[in-house]
Amino acid sequence: MAGAAPEGSQFDARQYDSKMTELLNAEGQDFFTSYDEVYHSFDAMGLKENLLRGIYAYGFEKPSAIQQRGIVPFCKGLDVIQQAQSGTGKTATFCSGILQQLDYELLDCQALVLAPTRELAQQIEKVMRALGDYLGVKVHACVGGTSVREDQRILSSGVHVVVGTPGRVFDMLRRQSLRPDHIKMFVLDEADEMLSRGFKDQIYDIFQLLPPKIQVGVFSATMPPEALEITRKFMNKPVRILVKRDELTLEGIKQFYVNVDKEEWKLETLCDLYETLAITQSVIFVNTRRKVDWLTDKMRSRDHTVSATHGDMDQNTRDIIMREFRSGSSRVLITTDLLARGIDVQQVSLVINYDLPTQPENYLHRIGRSGRFGRKGVSINFVTSDDERMLSDIQRFYNVVIEELPANVADLL
């Protein structure tokens, strides 16, 4: 199962590499700026004292690989394209760069961050607020499913940073509730998700309304060639910090598969795992909203305490469920890919792919929920005969070997 992808596999790793190489070399080095400096401590980065206080209070001790290379060029006002896997402090990289450059005397929006989902936008807002706690930063998340009038009230009272989803942000700009005059930093987070799906036109529309001289940061866990191509229109000689696919191993997360003969037997396998393992907190991924509801009912009928969230639920319900999960009062969360990127919970030790993702790229976003910030994590993939091709695709895409679940899995958690 760990070998090459079977004939007819839907993912062509060689084609991906050749497209990426062609794209990156298409304009030689004229398109990019090189920036090779690495900073092994936050203290060496020349950051404001009160920003350092916020970074250390948040729990960071030393910078991750992407932070060592990515914070300073952003602080210097350079355009940047940065790729790093989930759980490596990517969000804190651009938050630090923004917080370092804000004029706190000016209570106008100076930085705009776009994210693909409400949950992720709200997570970024929390990180920005926490890191900027000693700086007095004012941040607001503009997302769908919330009161337009409340957004307008908060924006009119003055904020330094707006984080949001493209639809609501464009609406606020169109209504002139969000004024772009002082915006000097524009960040796209999870650019792969936004640029390769339906948000492309909205991002263009937003960009047209921003001042001509603006710093642009593009951050993502995966960077498809199509996403890089679009950034050319926005960016001026960006610094490129790319992690090759063979480095996207999600260090510290042990990855296993369990062979399940029939789809119907996955439920028994799942219940067996929960009865034998002592799990702090875990996330279970399935591929459809209907299956979230079905699996939640089945687990509860067997006396397992689980909570569930998916895109059909209203925003208030989703917020309450995520709050309970973050606080630890709920220990098992069942969800879909849609919400994978907004789940940032420190104590998650196990991710179970009840269904394998339909795209190799989404595997990274799912299993990056475990082992956050250097903690140990385990991911377990349920694999039927129909899933073998996708498992091979995932292994080739990330250049990893996913081994069969050992008998002593309890020792790994």
From Swiss-Prot:
Residues 71-241 form the Helicase ATP-binding domain. It comes from the Eukaryota. Belongs to the DEAD box helicase family. eIF4A subfamily. Keywords: ATP-binding, Helicase, Hydrolase, Initiation factor, Nucleotide-binding, Protein biosynthesis, RNA-binding. A motif (DEAD box) lies at residues 189-192. This is Eukaryotic initiation factor 4A-9. eIF4F is a multi-subunit complex, the composition of which varies with external and internal environmental conditions. It is composed of at least EIF4A, EIF4E and EIF4G. SUPFAM superfamilies: P-loop containing nucleoside triphosphate hydrolases (SSF52540). ATP-dependent RNA helicase which is a subunit of the eIF4F complex involved in cap recognition and is required for mRNA binding to ribosome. In the current model of translation initiation, eIF4A unwinds RNA secondary structures in the 5'-UTR of mRNAs which is necessary to allow efficient binding of the small ribosomal subunit, and subsequent scanning for the initiator codon. Coiled coil: none annotated. The lineage of its organism: Eukaryota, Viridiplantae, Streptophyta, Embryophyta, Tracheophyta. Residues 252-413 form the Helicase C-terminal domain. GO terms for molecular function: ATP binding; ATP hydrolysis activity; RNA binding; RNA helicase activity; translation initiation factor activity. Its EC number is 3.6.4.13. GO terms for cellular component: cytoplasmic stress granule. It holds the Pfam family Helicase_C. A motif (Q motif) lies at residues 40-68. InterPro entries: DEAD/DEAH_box_helicase_dom, Helicase_ATP-bd, Helicase_C-like, P-loop_NTPase, RNA-helicase_DEAD-box_CS, RNA_helicase_DEAD_Q_motif.
